[in-house]
């Protein structure tokens, strides 16, 4: 009897643990009629943006104006969206627990109220704050416009004297509200997205960096944290500044990041198989690498702007672009590569020399000058 009781307890415990690691999204529409047609929503999709691509995580039929998603919760909170409407989507944070969406009008999905879990409750608070800021801004502008003397109505330059200060006041009120919200919820992953979508368009990178520095350690492992750090570094990119971190896959599918080589000099080389000027640099790269045969202080990280695997790998093989200190990576997204955007690459070849601390030393080293510079690193005579 005792064994049966213990077994029952274990079974109940296992079921409870399984439930604890799951999410349920319950959605309800007050109307399922679309905005731009008389048709109704038949199916909705739970989607996530992965490396710039929409990935469908699950689908759900709409029955009696209701839909449900259920599954294993991600280890870290992730921003997702529900699509299937013709006038926008519903954004929410995917995490453990029951997430309630609505009731809402399918014609205006962005107006859906979201809640039920910690992150989504905080996210809804942010949406409410944003709506309140917009409402107050409109009220201030309306009051300013009503205060314009009748004799000045219709005279743009004269009207600006009344309305211009309101733009400034509205901007400052919004900034203060956003900073206060972030400070009040600094431990929540939601603030990562508030920083990205509310701070970056209106704040200087110096101010944004202050708030990024204040984020707790347990948020540093989230992909969005890395994205924020990279965006600030990209905006401030110059000699002496910290380099953005970029990642890609080697030809054999291994994931490699620039930060993997911290403690070494990295010669970051943006190129492509179809780029004739890039190919003209190959002999110089080989010459520089020949000096590093017995040295582990230097790595050449060649990031390809190719979008075709065969073109990339065949070029590497045909030109024997192989050395123990030569690493090749790419995302095969061509000019849409995030790495090219972070380093503001406008043309290739484009090179960046990065020191062991991850700071930019020099841009656009090429030819004999590049060989001489890299040789000095290998020899230990660089300054």
Predicted segments, located by residue:
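N-terminal "domain-start" segment that seeds a small globular fold
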Residues: 224-259, 327, 372-380
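Conserved helix-turn-beta segment immediately C-terminal to the redox Cys motif
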Residues: 280-303, 379-381
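Short, internal strand/loop/helix patches
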Residues: 313-348, 356
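N-terminal targeting signals for export/organelle localization
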Residues: 85, 89, 99-102, 109-111, ...
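Conserved redox-active cysteine motifs that mediate thiol-disulfide chemistry
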Residues: 262-263, 270-287
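A non-transmembrane, solvent-exposed segment enriched in polar/low-complexity residues
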Residues: 19-169
